[in-house]
Amino acid sequence: TKTEKNLWEAFAGESQARNKYTFFASVAKKEGYEQLAAIFEETAANEKEHAKMWFKALHGGSIPDTMTCLEMAAGGEHDEWTEMYPRMAKEAKEEGFPQLAALFTMVAQIEKEHEERYRELAENLKNNQVFAREEQQVWQCRNCGYTYIGKSAPLKCPVCAHPQSYFELKKHNY
């Protein structure tokens, strides 16, 4: 319907405005205009709420459950790396913008990794492996940093009392 098309347009417009205003706030802060930065940030928060309202309207009045969100995210990332960015890279190259073509190609690779991450997370959710694994793991509380070794994360952090939802597998990336 025209109304659905308008909802998608409103969602896209508000989403883009939010990002622009966040970028503008950074510039204003850098240039020493704290009040102007705060106004951009406030407006960005307003735009986020407007986008959320339209997104909910597009999805029956609420944001879908986590599994659906993971599937939607993976699908969006898939379209970006297989269709959108390759097309944009080709067009940029044809029009004489090799640097932009290279950036589109590199970002496509990032989007592929995003898709893979979302699909793996969806599998973890489907298989009840978000907070439990078959082998011992190091779990870390995202709130206070407490670590626990076990097959599943504690139901409650013994240090800060945050629920199991705050635990994740501890990352070693250094």
Question: Model-found features: residue ranges?
Answer:
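Non-heme di-metal
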Residues: 1-174
